[in-house]
Structure formats: C-alpha cells, structure tokens
C-alpha cells in the first residue's frame, strides 16, 4: 500500500475515533481526527440479478443509484414525476412518472428513497418495513435497513468501504487510497488465478 496516509482506529462500544496521519508532506505533520459511530450493519454482497429494485426520486443521486443497480443486473424501476436529463437518456431503466404510491413496491427486493422530500422518504421507509422490503434512505443511515458502500472493482475483485454513513469524507479518502493500491493489474492477476485453479 502506498505510504501516503497512516490510519489509526480506536474503538469503545459503539463509538470509534479515527486518526489519519498525512505523510505526503515530509517537513510537517498533519493530523485529522473523526469521531464516528461504529456501524451496526452486517456487511453483505447482494445478488440483485433479475430482481425488481425500486428507486423513488429522479435527481442525479437517484440516477447514480439506478446505474449502479442496473450494472449489477437488477430490473430497475424509477418512480418520479420528473427525472434528470441523464436519467432520460439511460437505457434499461423503467420509469413510472407519477408521485410515489405504496403499490409501486409490489414484488420489490429493495427500495431506495432518494428524494428531497422528508415526508415522502419517511412514507417509503414505513411502507417498505411493513412489507419486509429492505430500504435505503439517501444521507439518512438512521432510517436505513441497508447502506450502499463505496466500492472499488477490479474484475472479480470488489473492495467495499463504509463508515456506516458517519463520515462520507473518510470513506472517500480511504477509497481513493485503495484505488491507488489496487490497480487495474489485479483484474488480470485474478483472471490468471481463476484459470490456474480450474486446472488444479
């Protein structure tokens, strides 16, 4: 791993202290400190292939979530009276251009609430919980039954980074470090290992 930052994690109960030492500047020392809540979430990779995944909202955040689910093979349904221009031009996504209604969750594996309307997001959460559907409310981890981590993908290698929603800045910083440490060559390396394993 490239020697740019040194991370220290001190935990006690549900609280954690993260100290990051910046080693990029040789003449001075820079420290950054975050106090965060330890994640209550169980890390898991979910197979969404061919599964209905609903996104409530039509903005750029909703667009990014929709693209991520589509790339993973999900049947993506976006519910919003209006959608951003990027969403309009995206193929492979079904649109329901209406205000949110509970019936739009029929048959869904998961739902993501990505609107700027707190009342709508709350209703989506309650409806999903009532139906036993896992739900994510963007930027509100306290209302989520699952969260979406930052990921680095190198072929079959997938590295996930999450602070449980406590500090997106820390999450981004760590992800960027890992992106540098695990380059594109890891995709070829894992392909080779897979072929070698099949011959064993």
Task: Cite the ranges covered by each PLM segment.
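Residue-level detector of alpha-helix initiation sites
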Residues: 59-61, 119, 165
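Short, Lys/Arg-enriched N-terminal segments with co-localized hydrophobic residues
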Residues: 17-37
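Glycine-rich, highly charged phosphate/nucleotide-binding loops
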Residues: 91-106
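ADP-ribose/adenylate-binding Rossmann-like module
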Residues: 110-114, 121-147
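An accessory alpha-helical subdomain
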Residues: 165-200
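Hydrophobic, well-ordered beta-alpha structural blocks that scaffold small-molecule cofactor pockets
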Residues: 35-82, 87-88
């Amino acid at each position: 791993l490239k020697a740019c930052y040194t991370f220290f994690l001190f935990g006690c109960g549900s609280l954690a202290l993260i100290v990051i030492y910046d080693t990029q500047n040789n003449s001075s020392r820079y420290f950054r400190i975050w106090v965060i809540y330890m994640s209550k979430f169980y890390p898991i990779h979910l197979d969404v292939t061919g599964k209905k995944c609903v996104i409530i909202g039509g903005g750029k955040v909703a667009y990014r979530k929709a693209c991520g689910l589509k790339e993973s093979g999900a049947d993506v349904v976006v519910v919003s009276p209006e959608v951003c221009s990027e969403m309009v031009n995206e193929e492979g996504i079904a649109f329901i251009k209406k205000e949110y209604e509970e019936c739009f969750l029929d048959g869904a594996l998961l739902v993501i609430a990505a609107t700027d309307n707190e009342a709508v997001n709350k209703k989506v959460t309650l409806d999903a919980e009532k139906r036993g559907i896992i739900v994510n409310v963007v930027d509100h981890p306290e209302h989520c039954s699952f969260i979406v981590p930052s990921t680095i993908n190198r072929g079959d290698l997938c590295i996930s980074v999450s602070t449980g929603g406590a500090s997106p800045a820390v999450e981004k910083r760590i992800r960027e470090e890992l992106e540098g440490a695990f380059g594109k060559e890891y995709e070829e390396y894992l392909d080779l290992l897979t072929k070698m394993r099949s011959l064993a």
